[in-house]
Regions:
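A generic "cationic amphipathic patch" detector
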Residues: 73, 81, 115, 150, ...
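Predominantly the structural core of cysteine protease catalytic domains
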Residues: 91-198, 202, 234
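General structural signal for secondary-structure boundaries
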Residues: 74-79, 94-97, 119-122, 214-221
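Generic hydrophobic, helix-prone segments enriched in Leu/Val/Ile
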Residues: 2, 81, 125-129, 222
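Active-site-adjacent structural segments surrounding the nucleophilic cysteine of cysteine proteases
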Residues: 1-108, 183
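Surface-exposed beta-strand edges and their flanking turn/coil or helix-capping segments
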Residues: 21, 64, 75, 149-152, ...
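Solvent-exposed loop/turn segments at secondary-structure junctions
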Residues: 55-59, 66-67, 86-92, 120-121, ...
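Noncatalytic regulatory segments and standalone regulatory/sensor domains
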Residues: 5-33, 156, 162-235
């Protein structure tokens, strides 16, 4: 399908004919560091990532990229990104095509889009998230994964970190008996935006509306369901 996007801007913005004004790195770093919330239970979570609800259209990839781009002060629109990625109604995006389009927009804004092959180590996750930089995560959003994430997110609220860590360790041991997702099974992209070092968990957010702003899963489970690629927009 074709989409029409109408943008109403101030005269001085329109006069620039779409050229972006780069937000200074130092200013953006301070803003992002201020977005990092450190909780008493050891959770470290990035707040204020814009929510974009993909709705029933299956636009998880363009919606998720829009969220991260807007968080990095880069103008973005889910529908325009969907066209760039040849996204059809109901989903299905040519990732490489979309990434190339995003790279251009990110570069114009003075940022860099880096591809991370494989799932990052916990230390790598910490490095980005502590600085307030979220990670786009390619993964398999299976029924088992979502049921587990929903249950854990609810249960962990009433548990002490040390006790909860033992529960997570037992759960991680059962991964050996869990088959790996098939290559094209339930492919999805969401955003990793938090971690807990004591419990070795990660927080992630989906482009499905406010109810999916923050969910939790163990880092080992996240690696198990990873589709092998992540992306980070850096300064």
């Amino acid at each position: 399908g074709e989409f029409v996007s109408l943008s109403i801007d101030k005269i001085e913005v329109a006069d620039k004919r779409g050229r972006q004004t780069k937000v200074a790195d130092m200013h953006l770093r301070r803003v992002h560091e201020a977005n990092v919330e450190k909780r008493d239970n050891g959770d470290v979570v990035i707040l204020n990532i814009p929510m974009v609800d993909q709705g029933p259209k299956g636009y998880c990839v363009p919606a998720t990229f829009e969220r991260c781009m807007r968080y990095m002060e880069i103008p973005a629109d889910m529908y325009l990104l969907a066209m760039a990625g040849n996204t059809g109604m109901g989903g299905g995006t040519v990732i490489s095509t979309l990434v190339n389009a995003v790279q251009q927009e990110v570069w114009v804004a003075g940022r860099t889009l880096n591809t991370l092959n494989g799932f990052p180590t916990f230390k790598e996750l910490e490095k980005y998230l502590k600085d307030g930089v979220p990670i786009l995560w390619g993964m398999h959003s299976t029924q088992w994964f979502n049921d587990t994430a929903n249950r854990r997110t609810s249960m962990r609220k009433a548990s002490q970190p040390d006790m909860w860590r033992k529960i997570i360790e037992k759960a991680d041991q059962k991964l050996e008996d869990l088959s790996s997702p098939q290559r094209g099974e339930n492919l999805h992209i969401c955003i990793i935006h938090g971690f807990n070092k004591t419990t070795q968990e990660i927080a992630f957010t989906d482009s499905w509306g406010p109810r999916f702003t923050e969910r939790w899963i163990s880092a080992k489970e996240a690696e198990h369901f990873s589709s092998g690629r992540c992306w980070v927009i850096e300064y």
